[in-house]
Amino acid sequence: MNPTVAAASVIAAALAVGLAAIGPGFGQGNASGEAVSGIARQPEAEGKIRGTLLLSLAFMESLTIYGLVIALVLLFANPFA
């Protein structure tokens, strides 16, 4: 494998994981904070809020997992080598 391609693949994998985690990280923090304030305002709606929160957190986390998959493909099954 060309050393330049290998170095670029490692850098791209690091960027893929790092950038894929930034957006969902902010989104999960914001969603969790809003859920806590919603439960504080309406304690009787805790079940619905928690269920919706967990579903939305799973969808946000899937974006990070996609970034991890792309990084693993670049590192171990490099299509550019």
UniProtKB/Swiss-Prot annotation:
A GO-annotated cellular component: proton-transporting ATP synthase complex
UniProt KW keywords: ATP synthesis, CF(0), Hydrogen ion transport, Ion transport, Lipid-binding, Membrane, Thylakoid, Transmembrane, Transmembrane helix, Transport
Main location: membrane
Membrane-spanning residues: 6-26, 57-77
Localization, UniProt: Cellular thylakoid membrane
Record GO terms (molecular function): lipid binding; proton-transporting ATP synthase activity, rotational mechanism
Annotated site location: Reversibly protonated during proton transport: 61
Pfam families: ATP-synt_C (PF00137)
Membrane association type: Multi-pass membrane protein
PROSITE patterns with a match to the protein in the record: ATPASE_C
General function of this protein: F(1)F(0) ATP synthase produces ATP from ADP in the presence of a proton or sodium gradient. F-type ATPases consist of two structural domains, F(1) containing the extramembraneous catalytic core and F(0) containing the membrane proton channel, linked together by a central stalk and a peripheral stalk. During catalysis, ATP synthesis in the catalytic domain of F(1) is coupled via a rotary mechanism of the central stalk subunits to proton translocation.
Record note on quaternary structure: F-type ATPases have 2 components, F(1) - the catalytic core - and F(0) - the membrane proton channel. F(1) has five subunits: alpha(3), beta(3), gamma(1), delta(1), epsilon(1). F(0) has four main subunits: a(1), b(1), b'(1) and c(10-14). The alpha and beta chains form an alternating ring which encloses part of the gamma chain. F(1) is attached to F(0) by a central stalk formed by the gamma and epsilon chains, while a peripheral stalk is formed by the delta, b and b' chains.
Family statement: Belongs to the ATPase C chain family.
Protein name stated in the entry: ATP synthase subunit c
Species of origin: Rippkaea orientalis (strain PCC 8801 / RF-1) (Cyanothece sp. (strain PCC 8801))
Gene: atpE
